[in-house]
């Protein structure tokens, strides 16, 4: 279950970033996180990584979204 939540959040970050028209590098610059860190969070292997609520808050703020959007269930379709 714990691994699933990291995957869910990572995919929702990717979805919201794309909806905002941002690249991973642009999001990294807005959050002051590294591009590699953003890439890992969004990757399918993100379930191996952990990140804090403070990190999610910073990302949600950079995306100008409510942090709760990062915990929404994924659509049946891929979140390309």
What is each PLM-predicted segment?
Residues 22-41:
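Short alpha-helical DNA-recognition segment
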Residues 11, 21-22, 51-54:
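Residue-level signal for the short linker/turn that defines the boundary of a DNA-recognition helix
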Residues 45-61:
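Short, basic-rich loop-to-helix N-cap that marks the start of a DNA-contacting helix
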Residues 17, 28, 60:
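The alpha-helix within a helix-turn-helix
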Residues 69-80:
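Short, charged recognition helix plus adjacent turn
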């Amino acid at each position: 279950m714990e691994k699933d939540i990291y995957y869910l959040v990572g995919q929702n970050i990717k979805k919201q970033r794309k909806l905002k028209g941002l690249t991973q590098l642009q999001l990294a610059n807005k959050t002051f996180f590294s591009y590699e860190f953003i890439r890992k969070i969004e990757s399918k292997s993100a379930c191996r990584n952990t990140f804090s609520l403070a990190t999610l808050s910073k990302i949600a703020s950079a995306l100008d979204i409510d942090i709760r959007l990062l915990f929404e269930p994924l659509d049946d379709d891929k979140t390309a």
